[in-house]
């Protein structure tokens, strides 16, 4: 396509992540958005296991069994003239590294908050990452169908705890069993609360904010309270400011109930209107790659094994940063300088997919990987090499020895470990002295998921033995003496063969540094 066609296609892309604390309803709202995109006919809720209706975005076996998201899912659909790329992220803190990497691949974020709980720890952490990147944040306060905290308390907490201005796009008229509707401040109307199969019902407002014609809410005391609250926030709150939204300084706030699909369409319509088109991406040398640049470029932010367990495949997820992708094109892999032909490409609906012929900047595509790619790799066309900035990597704080339960199944054991480690959910180390495999993780749940997937996907039961070590520190190979190792500071090597010590605690680390004052230890490579 020519430059003008490329620019138009790129401008129609909207790529965002949904972030929240566990159980705020993130996966449920994702399902409802897919309904509007015509991708699914019925939203499966996480709770509906007996009926077999699992959330479309929770595709992994362990997610279906436990009702949690443990991996980022990618879903695409067309709606109102836009191509929407949604990345549904794990809410559980043990999988925050996967979520952080995902946030590097999006142009905006939707923050889902439970109306009964307000801002929770994981929400705050993920918000801060978005803030650091300066990406726009849209807020959906969920679960209006249940009793929750006062709306004024929730918006005040949003501003106080997160330090961001907010603008209420709508305001709840009641909550729980007393929910009557939403006062749509921005669209100047009232959206009545109806059951999902009844569809939307609106009452238009006149210039004074009064309902035109018959007012079914005139005798409701809650409605009078809502009018007073709206007068208060319009007088004392922030004004709607598109420029501040684009800079991530102001968050538009929407109320609704994802479970009953109430207020979700209103949110989606407004989001697509004000969310940013694909932005430029920074490279490691500090320059930026514009999305309408003719040459193709992108980076791999995720690798997922066994999305189709029948084929034991691996998919590398790519955020396209510039230009146009065509199936069968040749690209350079920046890390090796090697030229690769991208003949097997796919687009996603969580675990289902279809062959992808073309895509443009802003899109998320999948490449079948035979072992060429690593998380953080840059790929590009053209004469000038492109290397995008590094993706975040967490230093593990928990460690376990892992061995095969059945020594006769060493082949599947090794294959499983290598593939799952390449996804980046756990880190792999090997003892210098014994060659034992040691796994490192940020949280306990990562180990549980690893153990489950080894048995479920590779038919390899494993024995996990907890270790008392808590701190990982790398050492320059030239300064290394294997005699430095002891039970309290265990010498291991990472996947790249670089040496590091695992310390039991800060005291053990200080003791080591006092004994070897000239040795330089680093927390990350």
UniProtKB/Swiss-Prot annotation:
Residues 11-279 form the tr-type G domain. Signal peptide: none annotated. GO terms for molecular function: GTP binding; GTPase activity; translation release factor activity, codon nonspecific; translation release factor activity, codon specific. The keyword Protein biosynthesis applies. GO terms for biological process: regulation of translational termination. It comes from the Bacteria. It is found in: Cytoplasm. It holds the Pfam family EF-G_D2. Keywords: Cytoplasm, GTP-binding, Nucleotide-binding, Protein biosynthesis. Its main location: cytoplasm. GTP binds at residues 20-27, 88-92, 142-145. GO terms for cellular component: cytosol. Increases the formation of ribosomal termination complexes and stimulates activities of RF-1 and RF-2. It binds guanine nucleotides and has strong preference for UGA stop codons. It may interact directly with the ribosome. The stimulation of RF-1 and RF-2 is significantly reduced by GTP and GDP, but not by GMP. HAMAP family: Rel_fac_3. Belongs to the TRAFAC class translation factor GTPase superfamily. Classic translation factor GTPase family. PrfC subfamily. This is Peptide chain release factor 3. The gene is prfC.
């Amino acid at each position: 396509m020519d430059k003008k066609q490329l620019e138009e296609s790129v401008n129609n892309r909207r790529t965002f992540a949904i972030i929240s604390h566990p159980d705020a309803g993130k996966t449920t709202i994702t399902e409802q958005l897919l309904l509007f995109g015509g991708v699914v006919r019925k939203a499966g809720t996480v709770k509906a296991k007996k009926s077999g209706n699992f959330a479309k975005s929770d595709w992994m076996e362990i997610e279906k069994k436990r009702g949690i998201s443990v991996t980022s899912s990618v879903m695409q659909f067309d709606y109102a003239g836009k191509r929407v790329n949604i990345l549904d992220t794990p809410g559980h803190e043990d999988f925050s590294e996967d979520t952080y990497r995902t946030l590097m691949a999006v142009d905006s974020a939707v923050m889902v908050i439970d109306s009964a709980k307000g801002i929770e720890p994981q929400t705050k952490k993920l918000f801060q990452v978005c803030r650091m990147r300066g990406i726009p944040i849209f807020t959906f306060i969920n679960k209006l169908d249940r009793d929750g905290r006062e709306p004024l308390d929730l918006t005040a907490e949003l501003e106080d705890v997160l330090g961001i201005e907010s603008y209420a796009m709508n305001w709840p008229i009641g909550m729980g069993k007393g929910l009557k509707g939403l006062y749509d401040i921005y669209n100047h109307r009232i959206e009545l609360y109806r059951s999902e199969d009844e569809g939307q019902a609106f009452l238009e407002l006149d210039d004074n904010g009064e309902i035109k014609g018959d007012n079914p809410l005139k005798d409701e005391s809650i409605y009078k309270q809502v009018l007073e609250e709206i007068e208060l926030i319009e007088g004392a709150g922030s004004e709607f400011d598109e420029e501040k939204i684009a800079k991530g300084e102001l968050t538009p706030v929407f109320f609704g109930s994802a479970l009953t699909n109430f207020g979700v369409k209103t949110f989606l319509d407004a989001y697509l209107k004000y969310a940013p088109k694909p932005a430029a991406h920074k490279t490691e040398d500090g320059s930026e790659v514009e999305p309408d640049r003719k040459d193709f470029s992108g980076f791999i932010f995720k690798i997922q094994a066994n999305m189709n367990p029948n084929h034991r495949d691996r998919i590398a997820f790519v955020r396209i940063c510039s230009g146009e992708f065509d199936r069968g094109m040749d690209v350079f892999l920046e890390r090796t300088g090697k030229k690769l032909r991208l003949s097997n490409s796919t687009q996603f609906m969580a675990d289902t997919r279809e062959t992808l012929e073309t895509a443009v900047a802003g899109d998320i595509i999948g490449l079948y990987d035979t072992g060429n790619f690593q998380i953080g790799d840059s790929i590009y066309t053209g004469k000038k090499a492109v290397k995008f900035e590094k993706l975040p990597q967490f230093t593990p704080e928990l460690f376990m020895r892992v061995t095969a339960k059945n020594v006769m199944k060493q082949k599947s054991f090794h294959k499983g470990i290598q593939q799952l480690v390449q996804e980046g959910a756990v880190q792999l180390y090997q003892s210098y002295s014994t060659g034992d495999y040691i796994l490192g993780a940020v949280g306990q749940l990562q180990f549980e998921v690893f153990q489950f997937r080894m048995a479920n996907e590779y038919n390899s039961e494993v024995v996990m033995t907890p270790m008392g070590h808590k701190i990982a520190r790398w050492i320059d190979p030239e300064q290394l003496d294997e005699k430095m190792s002891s039970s309290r500071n265990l010498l291991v090597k990472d996947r790249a063969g670089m040496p590091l010590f695992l310390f039991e605690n800060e005291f053990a680390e200080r003791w080591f540094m006092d004994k070897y004052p000239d040795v330089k230890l680093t927390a990350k490579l």
